[in-house]
Amino acid sequence: MSASASVGGPVPQPPPGPAAALPPGSAARALHVELPSQQRRLRHLRNIAARNIVNRNGHQLLDTYFTLHLCSTEKIYKEFYRSEVIKNSLNPTWRSLDFGIMPDRLDTSVSCFVVKIWGGKENIYQLLIEWKVCLDGLKYLGQQIHARNQNEIIFGLNDGYYGAPFEHKGYSNAQKTILLQVDQNCVRNSYDVFSLLRLHRAQCAIKQTQVTVQKIGKEIEEKLRLTSTSNELKKKSECLQLKILVLQNELERQKKALGREVALLHKQQIALQDKGSAFSAEHLKLQLQKESLNELRKECTAKRELFLKTNAQLTIRCRQLLSELSYIYPIDLNEHKDYFVCGVKLPNSEDFQAKDDGSIAVALGYTAHLVSMISFFLQVPLRYPIIHKGSRSTIKDNINDKLTEKEREFPLYPKGGEKLQFDYGVYLLNKNIAQLRYQHGLGTPDLRQTLPNLKNFMEHGLMVRCDRHHTSSAIPVPKRQSSIFGGADVGFSGGIPSPDKGHRKRASSENERLQYKTPPPSYNSALAQPVTTVPSMGETERKITSLSSSLDTSLDFSKENKKKGEDLVGSLNGGHANVHPSQEQGEALSGHRATVNGTLLPSEQAGSASVQLPGEFHPVSEAELCCTVEQAEEIIGLEATGFASGDQLEAFNCIPVDSAVAVECDEQVLGEFEEFSRRIYALNENVSSFRRPRRSSDK
């Protein structure tokens, strides 16, 4: 459905009247001046907008576009302009008209034309509004678009927006402004008739010239079409002549370049001969340098081996110190899931009670010393330094910038009303434990569990058992040539001085004597393990496999050791008495020279009866004659200081290990053997640091 209207019409001339002039020098300027003689043309049109479109298609919004048509009195011609489509709008404003896409011969001087607005959905459009517009009859609306009527079309011209006077549709009888106020300084004379005629003649001459140009252009094109064949042949001939000339010039240039290349070739041949002579001389130098490099490589290999040996010795020493540290400060767990350090209970940080202040201070002192020594051995500086003072140990916080220098030290013992400082000190200690765990790839989900975290770190991070009831993993004992390590250890030069003989302190009281007469649990368990334990079939196979490792096969035992081992096997198989040590036997053992920290030496072990279960027979072979690492270290330490003879380890064939060692090559066997040698050398260097002195000993 469309709305059709005719806007504009003949406008009557205004009656003559005086023109009121604005006062001189006034700054007021009229943006729009309605002149009676002003004419509006199609070329003055800038854009078109529609407002309040009535939609009768049932859609809330429409897609719209407009078309422009020229018209006469009886006929509307085909569209000469189509706008873009605006989606979903009943008040579209199309962009400015582009006269560049309009036909070239379009007469833009017309003032009457037809505007059709189309609307619809999904590419189905129908005519909504159709206006026949006379631009001279439009009404000025202002500098902005204002529309109040339905289906109203707004035309944007140079000086503002115009619309149809809806109060006088069809034919406008409204008179234009007859009173015009202008500045007198702006009044100028218009063109006279003769000037307009000159402009008209100039336009006609320009059009005539354009027609002449088009005519001459067509004539030229016709002549070119007729002479195109001959021109093509001439063009080809000239191109060939030009190519011949270019090729001749190129031939001359290539000849000159060839002469230069030949001369350069002779120079390069001479230079190449000189380089060949220099290369021969440098090759001789290289051979000499290779020989020197081989010597340096051998020296580097020797230094690298020395470095690896020293580094391995340092690592073994560190592991030994950590093992000793775990023996000094054992962490135990009872049946009530309570953790003890050196027999002193230490609950978690949130379970402290006031009645346990003394034991808590002692346990925290042990724990702080253990953490600080672990960090010292591992060469890992603690984030929060620990000041060890026994049960009055403290810890410092040098990180928090809100604390003064006097407030940075926190106690690790309950101290009156300073509960907050004590709790914070325990928190810093737990942070240090978490730091050590993080260094070894262990997380700390709960900081409050002080001893559980520390025990887990030592067992899983450092691979060290934290209680006294364990035996260390063992390594095979090589054949010993002398009781003193002056020149018997493999991988070390002779002449190493043995440490000075020292005397151990006597027990200061009878209680200490009784205390040190009792052997350590780890040594008793280690002594009883190969005798009283009846392994299952799987364990027996595993032990046999471990004893048959490459370390055992790489050792060269003397016939004398084998003979003593067979005698010891016979003595062990010959007796069947159970071992029941009494108090008197314990005192005798503590006073006997052949006991080491509560552990019988091989000479006494041979006289003891092995314990076997009834109904089962387990033959003791030569490979089962073994001792723990602790026993071997004690025996070697006493031999190094001169407290024992050099044949105590001869009866042992090996030291048991936890699992078999997979051997890929002889280098691995030699490396493991050198590791054992380094360990024995470290023990020989400083015997006193490997075992705590027993006060029950007289020496």
From Swiss-Prot:
Give the primary localization class.
other
Tell me where in this chain the PTM Phosphoserine is found: 493, 498, 508, 522, 549-550, 571, 582, 689
Residue spans crossing the bilayer? none
One GO term in the molecular function aspect is:
SNARE binding
Q: Where is the composition biased (Polar residues)?
A: 523-535
Sections of the chain in a coiled coil: 224-305
Protein name per its UniProtKB record: UV radiation resistance-associated gene protein
Organism of origin is: Homo sapiens
